[in-house]
């Protein structure tokens, strides 16, 4: 008789972070205030369920600003945009709300500040990721992308007297540390951020997987294929020696994954809503799991304020003009 899973161990923390919460709320409140449609440049966050849910509410997701009609309301995604995109959007006269995660904006501000002081940059990140494109697009030149240690050996900055390193916020903490060490070894005078650019939520979710993986036979990560931080969670569990799969929904779970498994670890990327975690939990319980246990973990209480003009009382629909700090229950 094949053994079925007996216990589900839930990573803590998991799922939505403050930047994702804020980005989704910006789109929802813009629709509430201005009416549908609201245009969003790129997926607001990299999650299929979230994007489809917002589409149903009246959001239209576009990649090219030419696809947005004159006078429309436009939201920039949580990943941030380049200066060129921002300037083009302003020139086209859109009503713009910026849902860029404040921790990504922090990197943009640092790049702009140091560039004025004559710095060049080495950026650690994944080529083609919208966050990387947005950060590199803060300057016309002088940012060199490296994806691995081998790239560090090949990079050729114009000068090394003033050189700084920045990173994509959703990288593997361990990979970023290894690449940063290689940068430091080649350019000993390189300036590093006062605080690492990898965000608190990425760090916390990876730390939770490090605790989770050794205690289970299988790790399931809830997240979409385009989600960088979700992919890093799956890779991390595998690197720790635990078989791991990533699913966009409960329907993607395969029965054969659970053969011979007694304890399943479950986590979710920072853009994956808790409703998907519950659906995956229910599916695993249907396969035989009889208990669900939450791990001890860090409680995240960070909440980022909304842009001016979108602080709306949910009960009355009226704009809130004075409310500090912005408070409310965590999403999911």
Which role does the model predict for each range below?
Residues 1-268, 274-332:
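The feature marks the mature, well-folded catalytic cores of soluble enzymes
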